[in-house]
Curated annotation (Swiss-Prot):
Gene from which this protein is expressed: LIF
PANTHER family: LEUKEMIA INHIBITORY FACTOR
Protein name: Leukemia inhibitory factor
Organism phylogeny: Eukaryota, Metazoa, Chordata, Craniata, Vertebrata
Compartments, as annotated in UniProt: Secreted
Main location: secreted
Gene3D superfamilies membership: 1.20.1250.10
S-S bonds: C34-C156, C40-C153, C82-C185
Purpose: LIF has the capacity to induce terminal differentiation in leukemic cells. Its activities include the induction of hematopoietic differentiation in normal and myeloid leukemia cells, the induction of neuronal cell differentiation, and the stimulation of acute-phase protein synthesis in hepatocytes.
Provenance organism: Bos taurus (Bovine)
GO biological process: immune response; leukemia inhibitory factor signaling pathway; positive regulation of biosynthetic process; positive regulation of cell population proliferation; regulation of cell communication; regulation of cell differentiation; regulation of signaling
Family stated for the protein in its record: Belongs to the LIF/OSM family.
Length: 202
C-alpha cells in the first residue's frame, strides 16, 4: 500500500483509506488551528447546496451504471443485492442546528469519499473496460472533495470547528469478487438514498 501523504498518517487512516482514484480527502489534524488556506467565498452555503444538488441529480444514473456493469445476478436482484443496508453509515439529523448538520454532513462526505475510492479501485480491476463507470465515479469523487472542502471552510470560518472525527466503511481489498461487487452496490444504493435527504436539508 502506498502512503499518499507525507509525515505521520493516523493508523485509522492507514487501515481504512485505500483510495485508488487519487489523493486522500483532506482530514484536518487534531491540533490544527482553525485557519483556511483561502478566504471562504461569501456564497459558500449556495456552493454547498449546488454541490449537493449536483450529486443528487447524478446519484441514480451512477447507481444504474454500477449495477449494470456488474452483470448478472445484480440487475435482476436489486432488492436483495443492492439494498442500502450499510450498518456503520454516519447518521444525519435534518432538524439539527446548521452547525450540527454541517458536522454530520462532513462525516458522511468523508465516509462516502473513502468508500468511492474503494469502489473505484475495485472496479478498475473487476471491470477494466467500464470507462463510463470509472469516469462517473471519478467525477463524483471530485465533487465530494470540493464539497468536503467547502463544508470545512464553513465550519471553520463561522463555527471555529477545526477538527471532525470521521469513520470509514469496510475495506474491500480482502473480499472476494462477489462481495466487492455487492458492497459497492449497497454503498451506492445508500449514497443515492442519503444524498436526496442531504440535498433537501440544506
Amino acid at each position: 500500500m502506498k502512503v499518499l501523504a507525507a509525515g505521520v498518517v493516523p493508523l485509522l487512516l492507514v487501515l481504512h483509506w485505500k483510495h485508488g482514484a487519487g489523493s486522500p480527502l483532506p482530514i484536518t489534524p487534531v491540533n490544527a488551528t482553525c485557519a483556511t488556506r483561502h478566504p471562504c467565498p461569501s456564497n459558500l452555503m449556495n456552493q454547498i447546496r449546488n454541490q449537493l444538488g449536483q450529486l443528487n441529480s447524478s446519484a441514480n444514473s451512477l447507481f444504474i451504471l454500477y449495477y449494470t456493469a456488474q452483470g448478472e445476478p445484480f440487475p435482476n436482484n436489486l432488492d436483495k443485492l443492492c439494498s442500502p443496508n450499510v450498518t456503520d453509515f454516519p447518521p444525519f439529523h435534518a432538524n439539527g442546528t446548521e452547525k450540527a448538520r454541517l458536522v454530520e454532513l462532513y462525516r458522511i462526505i468523508a465516509y462516502l469519499g473513502a468508500s468511492l475510492g474503494n469502489i473505484t479501485r475495485d472496479q478498475k480491476v473487476l471491470n477494466p473496460y467500464a470507462h463510463g463507470l470509472h469516469s462517473k465515479l471519478s467525477t463524483t469523487a471530485d465533487v465530494l472533495r470540493g464539497l468536503l472542502s467547502n463544508v470545512l471552510c464553513r465550519l471553520c470560518s463561522k463555527y471555529h470547528v477545526s477538527h471532525v472525527d470521521v469513520t470509514y466503511g469496510p475495506d474491500t481489498s480482502g473480499k472476494d469478487v462477489f462481495q466487492k461487487k455487492k458492497l459497492g452496490c449497497q454503498l451506492l444504493g445508500k449514497y443515492k438514498q442519503v444524498i436526496a435527504v442531504l440535498a433537501q436539508a440544506f
